[in-house]
Amino acid sequence: MISRVYHWKQFWCPRMGRMSLTDGGYLDDPDAEWGRFSNPDVVPFETIASLPCLGLLGEPGMGKTRTLQAQRTAIDTQVQEEGGQTLWLDLRSYGSEERLIRDLFGNQTFLAWASGTFCLHIFLDSLDPTLSRVVEHFLE
């Protein structure tokens, strides 16, 4: 099976934000005049990149992983230029909570951040509800 990658501009919308689709189910272009009016909550990644917590949610196969992979180098560069660090984990390979806890909360980058020396940007790909509860519990 050939996997095609379309280099479309992608937009983000808050979970409870307003998003307007056309009759055909397509997003009104947020960069166009009418699209800005009908989709005021829909923005490109650059607009929200500085927010302290972001979650890219959606159905399996929508391209969330590809989106993160495409942005990773730019994100790493920007974060490093600002004096921060990144920590990327693909949770698809985790079968146990213990391993996730060890690899995330025992990670040297995470431990250095916990001592308060820099801003840490954590990227968790393939976060399912079970694993999200583990992460939420330890961040409390």
Predicted feature locations:
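P-loop NTPase signaling cores
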Residues: M1-E140
